[in-house]
A protein has these predicted regions:
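Acyl-donor-binding surface of acyltransferase catalytic domains
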Residues: 1-62, 165-169
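Acyl-donor binding region in acyl/amide transferases
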Residues: 2-8, 81-99, 104, 129-169
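Generic structural signal for short, flexible, solvent-exposed coil/loop and linker residues
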Residues: 4-5, 13, 74, 99-101, ...
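Short amphipathic alpha-helix that is part of the acyltransferase structural core
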Residues: 42, 50-97
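A short linear-motif detector with a strong N-terminal bias
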Residues: 45, 88-91, 111-114
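Short N-terminal helix-initiation segments at or just after the protein's N-terminus
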Residues: 51-60, 111-114, 129, 133
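Conserved beta-hairpin
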Residues: 106-120
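A short acidic/small-residue loop/turn micro-motif
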Residues: 124-128
């Protein structure tokens, strides 16, 4: 990975870290941040071109994937994200941490739906010609790689997909 790609990952992680850097953070949100940061140590990343994402068949249409732009979707995003942890207490702390997210154009949250049920979520950010797709989570009804491709098509449709994609595994 090049410097810009590494920086895009660092920026996203710093943004999430700073969510609870407030005057009176809850102990639950601080614990959730610690749990989240431990998970980050296990993450790997791959670099791909946008054509590899766009050439696959779609499972979800661009109309099935929504940019999170209000609190209820933020809560759905957080609940989906919490499924990445097996422990119930850790799930609760992750929800507490992630529901602190303040929506910003630099770091966009997406939630995918199938038959009215939330089935996938991710964070997307852009930095110097790179699109970072991170914090991927899918329900048992959807393949993670498929969701990345479907999200890529949504981003391309909205003219938000760079040539180079960094995908968090």
């Amino acid at each position: 990975m090049n410097e810009q790609q590494l920086e895009s990952i660092k920026r996203k992680n710093e943004w999430l870290h700073d969510l609870v850097e407030v005057e009176f953070p809850t102990k639950e949100s601080l614990e959730g941040r610690e749990i989240y940061n431990r998970m980050l140590e296990q993450k790997t990343y791959e670099v791909s071109s946008n054509t590899l994402l766009l050439d696959n068949e779609s499972n979800l249409s661009v109309e099935d994937i929504f940019l999170v732009d209000f609190h209820r979707l933020t809560v759905m995003f957080s609940i989906l994200q919490a499924q990445r942890w097996a422990d119930k207490h850790e799930q609760e702390m992750i929800v507490e941490f992630l529901t602190q997210i303040i929506l910003t154009p630099e770091f966009e949250l997406y939630v995918g739906f199938k038959e009215g049920e939330p089935v996938g979520a991710a964070i997307v950010s852009q930095y110097e010609g790179n699109t970072l797709i991170s914090d991927l989570v899918v329900s048992q009804n959807l393949d993670k790689r498929q969701f990345v491709c479907d999200l890529g098509k949504k981003l391309n449709h909205d003219q938000k997909l760079s040539e180079t994609i960094v995908i968090e595994n």
